[in-house]
UniProtKB/Swiss-Prot annotation:
GO terms for biological process: lipid metabolic process. Keywords: Lyase, Membrane. GO terms for cellular component: membrane. This is Variant-surface-glycoprotein phospholipase C. Monomer. It is a peripheral membrane protein. Residues 31-205 form the PI-PLC X-box domain. Its EC number is 4.6.1.14. It catalyses: a 6-(alpha-D-glucosaminyl)-1-(1,2-diacyl-sn-glycero-3-phospho)-1D-myo-inositol = 6-(alpha-D-glucosaminyl)-1D-myo-inositol 1,2-cyclic phosphate + a 1,2-diacyl-sn-glycerol. By hydrolysis of the attached glycolipid, releases soluble variant surface glycoprotein containing phosphoinositol from the cell wall of T.brucei after cell lysis. It also cleaves similar membrane anchors on some mammalian proteins. VSG lipase may play a role in processes such as parasite differentiation or antigenic variation.
Length: 380
């Protein structure tokens, strides 16, 4: 086996503290160079069949018409299985090793006093999620972990009752946010030494040129996250491959200046949701995002590992310049606990977090071999 395999085997790490445990390996890297797992719709774990529909629900379910009301009554329970992308709380996800949280925020039609997270249907209060993040970082075991907190969509009013309420919610983590004037290309070791508390990269989707919240980075300026909108594993992998092939046409060197989110997620069609009502029709029929993730996550892990460890894209060897982190940074999944893959020439089976830990050790070894270039991820 390669020396990196010995490093992985001999390095003591825990999912709750893996970044700190790998400090000697990833300290010279920027957050844009580290491989880590992200959770798609991280706060959707609270969606249930009784959850009201939110602002991002399909249009035919919204409105005040009798027809829309009837559809909401009929589809609320069915849609819940497809709206719930995670089954663990945010605290449990962080303890599992997730370091990127994708979230949407809106008002709740049944509780105007608080802001809620949502994915087509209302989930848990935003305050609960932020308290989970706060508790995780207050825990001495995980106090040195970095988190990317991405509020992709805000379904809020422009007045103080909307965005103002959102900003006040964020204030409970104000001493945890990494200032926006700190470049994403900053080595993690510098961030560890500069502050014992600031561990969160706050990203907010906004149509404005400047963020109205001082600690927030504008999503379009600091992150690449492309949704390929495919509902089959084959088409999803093809689309993800094509994103990298397109980026390779414009090679870049140095440290990537933006975070890159690989959206390794299946997009259900209305037909999938309808057929899911009758799961006994065929073994091929799935009735929830959980069922889909159970089937596709293992293949997605194998794809991500093959690309990053072996430099293989659909069986073809590719050379990825140091300045491109396409599919080499944040690996976003539904049901992050599902799926495993073989690493280290098939000698070890691990989950997505363990895979990323090994890839970071592998990357660090390449960086050590050639300190004049950003790390490469090819095993051989």
């Amino acid at each position: 086996m390669l020396p990196e395999s010995d490093d992985f085997t001999n390095t003591a790490w825990h999912p709750q503290s893996w970044m700190h445990d790998l400090r000697s390996f990833i300290g010279e890297m920027a957050i844009t160079q580290v491989c880590f797992v992200g959770s798609h719709d991280a706060a959707s774990y609270g969606v249930s069949k009784d959850s009201p529909f939110g602002a991002d629900a399909p249009g035919f379910l919204l409105g005040d018409s009798v027809f829309a009301s009837l559809l909401r009554f009929l589809f609320r329970g069915i849609c819940a299985s497809w709206s719930r992308c995670q089954w663990m709380s945010v605290r449990a996800q962080l303890n599992h090793g997730v370091r990127y949280l994708d979230m949407r925020v809106a008002t709740n039609p049944e509780d105007a006093s608080r802001l809620y997270t949502l994915h087509h249907q209302i989930s848990v209060p935003l305050a609960d999620v932020l308290e989970d993040v706060k508790a995780f970082l207050n825990d001495p075991l995980s106090a040195d972990e970095f988190i990317v907190l991405d509020f992709q969509h805000l379904y809020l009013t422009d007045d103080s009752d909307g965005k103002g309420k959102f900003f006040r919610e964020l204030d409970r983590l104000s001493d945890r946010f990494i200032p926006v004037d700190v470049p994403l290309t900053t080595p993690l070791e510098f961030l560890w030494r500069a502050s014992s508390r600031r561990r969160i990269f706050l990203v907010v989707g906004s149509g404005e040129d400047e963020s109205p919240y001082p600690a927030a980075r504008i999503r379009s300026k600091c992150m690449v996250s492309r949704w390929v909108n495919e509902n089959s594993l084959r088409k999803l992998l093809e689309a993800l491959d094509n994103l990298l092939l397109d980026d390779l046409k414009y090679p870049q060197t140095g440290v990537p200046s933006k975070l890159y989110v690989t959206q390794a997620v299946f997009t259900p069609r209305y037909s999938d949701i309808f057929l899911g009502i009758f799961p006994k029709i065929s073994r091929r029929v799935v009735s929830s995002i959980y069922d889909v993730a159970t089937r596709v996550n293992p293949s997605l892990l194998e794809w991500f590992y093959s690309l990053n460890a072996r430099g293989l894209l659909d069986g073809m060897k590719v050379m990825i310049p140091s300045g491109i982190n396409t599919h080499g940074n944040i690996f976003m999944l539904d049901c992050v606990e599902l799926g495993s893959c073989q690493i280290m020439d098939g000698t070890t089976e691990t989950n997505a977090v363990g895979m990323c830990v090994y890839l970071n050790i592998l990357r660090a070894s390449r960086l050590f071999e050639d300190s004049s270039a950003a790390p490469s991820l090819n095993e051989g």
